[in-house]
Amino acid sequence: MGGKWSKMAGWSTVRERMRRAEPARERMRRAEPRAEPAADGVGAVSRDLEKHGAITSSNTAATNADCAWLEAQEDEEVGFPVKPQVPLRPMTYKAAVDLSHFLKEKGGLEGLIHSQQRQDILDLWVYHTQGYFPDWQNYTPGPGVRYPLTFGWCFKLVPVEPEKIEEANEGENNSLLHPMSQHGMDDPEREVLQWRFDSRLAFHHMARELHPEYYKNC
């Protein structure tokens, strides 16, 4: 039975390979790296991206302030394209830690006086180059030190001492438009704040400890 096929060698090997072969879907599932979860403290849009891989109809410019803000930036001149070059994704714990150390090593953020415009520029740059939706850089309320809500982000906002503010505003070379001269206009507590790196924030989620009410849905 089988004619010339009965003389073909190697079938037993092929049969074993066929038996062990996984279905294509299962093989693809095993090959795909598991996506990292969004970091604790990110906003609603990032939670959408984590759960659904996209922004759903529950978060639009009409219902979500971060979506509305981002949409408005498309018409602004910020020095680089607003739309991301890479797939949109939520900020993760590891990415927040890595970004913190990158900015610490490169310099430019440590000790910089905070303003909403400067924060917006940083958020848009991270969004454009890395695809992280800009609802991750939020802080606890004042007065005093403002801790990041997103676990892994190691920059906090620290009030500048009044003496240093007064010293910086002395003389004729100071600019009234500089954030140091704005006397905390962006801040509800009217405090002048500056970014400060704190490596302990990678291990100690101060915001969650101080304000557990912000994390009820996490």
Curated annotation (Swiss-Prot):
Motif (Dileucine internalization motif): 176-177
SUPFAM superfamilies assigned: Regulatory factor Nef
Swiss-Prot/TrEMBL induction comment: Expressed early in the viral replication cycle.
Tagged with keyword Phosphoprotein: yes
Region ranges (Mediates dimerization, Nef-PTE1 interaction): 120-136
Record site feature (Might play a role in AP-1 recruitment to the Nef-MHC-I complex), residues: M18
UniProt key word Repeat: no
HAMAP family, sorted: NEF_HIV
Residues carrying the site annotation Cleavage: W69, L70
The protein's assembly and partners: Monomer; cytosolic form. Homodimer; membrane bound form. Interacts with Nef associated p21-activated kinase (PAK2); this interaction activates PAK2. Associates with the Nef-MHC-I-AP1 complex; this complex is required for MHC-I internalization. Interacts (via C-terminus) with host PI3-kinase. Interacts with host PACS1; this interaction seems to be weak. Interacts with host PACS2. Interacts with host LCK and MAPK3; these interactions inhibit the kinase activity of the latter. Interacts with host ATP6V1H; this interaction may play a role in CD4 endocytosis.
Comment on protein domains: The N-terminal domain is composed of the N-myristoyl glycine and of a cluster of positively charged amino acids. It is required for inner plasma membrane targeting of Nef and virion incorporation, and thereby for infectivity. This domain is also involved in binding to TP53. The SH3-binding domain constituted of PxxP motifs mediates binding to several Src family proteins thereby regulating their tyrosine kinase activity. The same motifs also mediates the association with MAPK3, PI3-kinase and TCR-zeta.
Source organism per UniProt: Human immunodeficiency virus type 1 group M subtype B (isolate BRVA) (HIV-1)
Location within or outside the cell: Host cell membrane; Virion; Secreted; Host Golgi apparatus membrane
Name of the protein in its database record: Protein Nef
Function: Factor of infectivity and pathogenicity, required for optimal virus replication. Alters numerous pathways of T-lymphocyte function and down-regulates immunity surface molecules in order to evade host defense and increase viral infectivity. Alters the functionality of other immunity cells, like dendritic cells, monocytes/macrophages and NK cells. In infected CD4(+) T-lymphocytes, down-regulates the surface MHC-I, mature MHC-II, CD4, CD28, CCR5 and CXCR4 molecules. Mediates internalization and degradation of host CD4 through the interaction of with the cytoplasmic tail of CD4, the recruitment of AP-2 (clathrin adapter protein complex 2), internalization through clathrin coated pits, and subsequent transport to endosomes and lysosomes for degradation. Diverts host MHC-I molecules to the trans-Golgi network-associated endosomal compartments by an endocytic pathway to finally target them for degradation.
